[in-house]
Amino acid sequence: MKTEMDAKSGIKEDVAALNEHLHSLDAAGRIELLAEKFSGRIVATTSFGLQAAVMLKLLRDHAPRIPVVFIDTGYLFAETYRYAALLQEELGFEARVYSPLVTAARQEALHGREWEGGTDGMNNYARIHKVEPMNRALQELGADVWLSGLRRAQSSGRSQREIAEKQARTLKSYPIIDWDDGKVERFMRDHRLPCHPLASAGYVTMGDWHSTSPGSESSRESTRFNGEKYECGLHLNSGQQDFQI
């Protein structure tokens, strides 16, 4: 009879074997493999951020049936909403939009501007506006496999991530995790993908308007959440038993 420890060990071995296979493939091959292996239980996410067009183009070309989830926090830049509309029209798809259960106006009226309340406030804001909607998306779409466009070059906290990993009950994979900024730029140029409007305004990363500021590539991690942290919470274990992430 398998113990809980045996089960966890088996999961780690499965992920290790999957990573070994994924390492031998390019980004397109990784997406095709995952789409076939986990058909019917896989989703992808997009933030419609600065480099989102890359993953969206790869998905449209190599796995167009994978649902694309967009978490609308209610606090994105106006330019991001317009860019989202442009990319969906250009690439010919419609994202599945998930929003918080509470409106931005109600949240602020009852709890204030939580993102100004230090790490605890930012974490609670992320749980309500990002983690809960994403968890709901996974549950409603029947998915336990999640594709994301994270890259090691984006931050020190992402530099050691593998192509695939377990996050709570969800298997996550990052098909372009090993792409550097130059490769991203070449791909966008070669495929004539439109750039986010704020890329020319000095932004090197993109999130909510209240917690993202312009900056240089060398200071990318200080441009989010007043430099107190980089991850919004979606790519960290929620630590809650009723969450998939």
Q: Residue ranges of each PLM-predicted region?
A:
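Nucleotide-activated chemistry modules centered on ATP-dependent adenylation/adenylyltransferase
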Residues: K2-I245
